[in-house]
Amino acid sequence: MLEFILKIQARDSKGLVSAISTTIANKGYNIVKNDEFVDPLKQRFFMRLKIQKEMKPLNTEIKEQEERSLKTALFKALENFSELLIGVILTHKKNIILLATKESHCLGDLLLRVYGGELNAQILGVISNYEILRPLVEKFDIPYFYAPCVDQILHEKEVLAIIKNLELKHKVSADLLVLAKYMRILSHDFTKRYENQILNIHHSFLPAFIGANPYQQAFERGVKVIGATAHFVNESLDAGPIILQDTLPINHNYSVEKMRLAGKDIEKLVLARALKLVLEDRVFVHENKTVVF
């Protein structure tokens, strides 16, 4: 069975859905899942489809030919619709690289979820500016790379070199970089190179409590809700398109340490859920917002 995910954006117009479905049918595919949304303010149309076709035999060359043919047919059928973006994605296990610093909760959770098959991904490697997480990562037989950060420019060059070497070794391109509590600020050049391909998680106290100890600040203010935000990374610090958020109610019984532990739990859950959405090609980015199916 040959299966593709189609991600289509365009200026909303009459006849758009009909043109898409007719093209898919003419190419011999069956639509097994369809989600669509129109932003009424922007007049922007979003559509995600899962389509299938019986084909034998199936090899890499045939899959690539079919992908090109389908994309060409869609662009031709929709050429009169404006602001058009079309993604034709062959369903496959995505290749990801994890970046971390010292904290283990998000990294360990992702390692377990990938190992257990909950996340359809292959972890090419883990990069960290500390050695402390090496024993954890190597328990999963995943390569661990230490990239010290005495100078941020040199550190980024080393990270990029590691990524390139991993891609060459596996003969693939990394689909996604996941910052599992990677506590470094990435440069504009780095984020542009991987636009909408870097996933980050942070506590949702920003921007109210900025600094090294947000939970202490939140405790002193007596906050009643803690949470986490998963987003794509762009050149603006913690301001990229938001993919997923969640919160947890707390009360006066929560100490700073209890808040911190609860915060870790919600961070790893939100990151894992957001990563699953991205791996399944459910996230559309338009301007600085997302549509998630």
Regions found by a protein language model. Name each.
Residues 1-94:
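A conserved regulatory-domain signal marking ACT and ACT-like small-molecule sensing domains
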Residues 30, 122, 143-145, 197:
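Conserved beta-strand segments of alpha/beta enzyme cores
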Residues 105-115:
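Histidine-anchored nucleotide/phosphate-binding helix
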Residues 96-105:
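Short, glycine-rich nucleotide/cofactor-binding loops
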Residues 129-130, 151, 155-158, 175-293:
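Donor/substrate-binding cores of folate-linked one-carbon enzymes
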Residues 138, 142-171:
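Adenosine-nucleotide cofactor-binding segment
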Residues 10, 100, 127-128:
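Short beta-strand/turn micro-motifs composed of small residues
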Residues 121-132:
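Short internal beta-strands
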